[in-house]
Amino acid sequence: MDVRRAQEIASSPVMANVTYNGQRIYIEHVDQQKGVATIHPLDNPSQKQSVPVASLEEHS
């Protein structure tokens, strides 16, 4: 995924189907300068982590 699309998803009120390492996640914030996103698994909101945006996959 690219940074622009990750930012669109993070800003959208519509939930997108995005995964990180095969796990469904929620994108909380995107740092466009660093190319990283703050995410958490849908089933564990307290497990926040920063990951490269390129490692995120969007599924339709």
UniProtKB/Swiss-Prot annotation:
It comes from the Bacteria. The keyword Glycoprotein does not apply. Induction: Expressed only in the forespore compartment of sporulating cells. Transmembrane segments: none annotated. GO terms for cellular component: endospore-forming forespore. Keywords: Sporulation. GO terms for biological process: asexual sporulation; sporulation resulting in formation of a cellular spore. Residues 38-60 are annotated as: Disordered. It is found in: Spore core. Pfam families: SspH (PF08141). Belongs to the SspH family. NCBIfam families: PRK03174.1, SASP_H. This is Small, acid-soluble spore protein H 2. It comes from Geobacillus thermodenitrificans (strain NG80-2). The lineage of its organism: Bacteria, Bacillati, Bacillota, Bacilli, Bacillales. The gene is sspH2.
